[in-house]
Amino acid sequence: MAGRRDRIQQLRGSRIAIAIFVGILIGCVCSVLFPNGFFNSGSSLIANEERISKSTSTDGLASCESSERVKMLKSDFSIISVKNAELRKQVRELTEKVRLAEQETENARKQVLVLGSEIKAGPFGTVKSLRTNPTVVPDESVNPRLAKLLEKVAVNKEIIVVLANSNVKPMLELQIASVKRVGIQNYLIVALDDSMESFCESKEVVFYKRDPDKAVDMVGKSGGNHAVSGLKFRVLREFLQLGYSVLLSDVDIVFLQNPFSHLHRDSDVESMSDGHDNNTAYGFNDVFDEPSMGWARYAHTMRIWVFNSGFFYLRPTIPSIDLLDRVADTLSKSEAWDQAVFNEQLFYPSHPGYTGLHASKRVMDMYEFMNSKVLFKTVRKNQELKKLKPVIVHLNYHPDKLERMHAVVEFYVNGKQDALDSFPDGSD
């Protein structure tokens, strides 16, 4: 028992010695790490905070001293911000134009791919044929002078073109007044003689005088309505080659609205009709009766009244240019009426010995693009139809054109309800 107590006492003594040693060791470490003591370290932190506070106060004084400079900078920044906003707006507008141009280019590329590659037909009711042919690549070398003029006058690569000589000044003057009244900007007169140039200048209307061409000049300077009308198929070709869509207009037309807001632009040719009702304007099944054939006496035929060659819209496509070439060539070899040839080329199908024109076509709404037969035979006698305001009125069915043009202005522009009443349906 005595030996056991001695071992316990020795163990306690060694523990005390170890504790003393550890305490001394910790004290040495603290003296090295904190030579100024714990409380002096806290004082140092306080001093640092005071230095920081003094520094902040100094900065505050400096900022107060430069407040005027800050105000000037803010004013400059405000001015720059306004200018920057204007520039951003211009960039957005230009970006949108580029996007639209790229979209048109992409659509044309897709059309070429569709036309040049094999495709599979979709499910029933989903297949649609290609109606809108791709436009040609513009070629400014064809007529650099005209290209510069169209770049200034055309809107969205579209232009109204009117061929005129001095024989039609009274009607043209009335048409120009209607164009200005509506606010149409992209309107161009092709002056066929010197007198017409002077007339256009006096009316402040944009005009274009072609380079000398004997074949055109001879007719243009002295020809009547029909002769001049036939020239357009030669003249319009350059417009299409330059990449512009053309809305051809005769002079016996009154503009009451901007026609470009009423076009579909999905076909090569978009034309007003000479028809006077739904059947004649848009087509109908005409049954031919031949009693001698007995059981087969009835033969079905498709009929439509002609497209009017005095007001039509052409997209700059190969079929459109082909149409102009065909009509111009036929007219150069015969005394045919240009409107008859225009429709023959549009509607005759390919058959043995003849290759037809593969152009897509659309008939304009006959109440928007109204001929004078529709107006005087139907519309003026119908109280509901009289409330409609057409886009144009074409006095193509009547020889007393100028008088009726004035009456159209009186009725649709000035509101004179009886302005159309004194005229007969047809001509005397």
From Swiss-Prot:
Ranges that cross the membrane: 16-36
One protein family per Pfam: Nucleotid_trans
Membrane topology annotation: Single-pass type II membrane protein
Source superkingdom: Eukaryota
Xref: InterPro entries: Nucl-diP-sugar_transferase, Nucleotide-diphossugar_trans, RRA1/2/3
Chain span(s) of sequence motif DXD motif: 250-252
Entry EC no(s): 2.4.2.-
Subcellular location field: Golgi apparatus membrane
GO molecular function, one term: glycosyltransferase activity
Segments on the Lumenal side according to the record's topology features: 37-428
Glycosites: 278
Main location: Golgi
GO annotation, biological process: cell wall organization; root hair cell development
Alphabetical UniProt keywords: Cell wall biogenesis/degradation, Glycoprotein, Glycosyltransferase, Golgi apparatus, Membrane, Signal-anchor, Transferase, Transmembrane, Transmembrane helix
Tissue specificity statement from the Swiss-Prot or TrEMBL entry: Expressed in roots, rosette and cauline leaves, stems, flowers and siliques.
Phenotype of gene-disrupted mutants: Reduced arabinose content in the insoluble cell wall fraction of meristematic region. Reduced root hair length and content of arabinosylated extensins in root cell walls.
Enzyme class: transferase
Cellular component terms per the entry's GO annotation: Golgi membrane
Cytoplasmic side: 1-15
Record's function text: Plays a role in the arabinosylation of cell wall components. Involved in the arabinosylation of extensin proteins in root hair cells. Extensins are structural glycoproteins present in cell walls and its arabinosylation is important for root hair cell development.
Family: Belongs to the glycosyltransferase 77 family.
Description of its domains: The conserved DXD motif is involved in enzyme activity.
Protein name per its UniProtKB record: Arabinosyltransferase RRA2
Originating species: Arabidopsis thaliana (Mouse-ear cress)
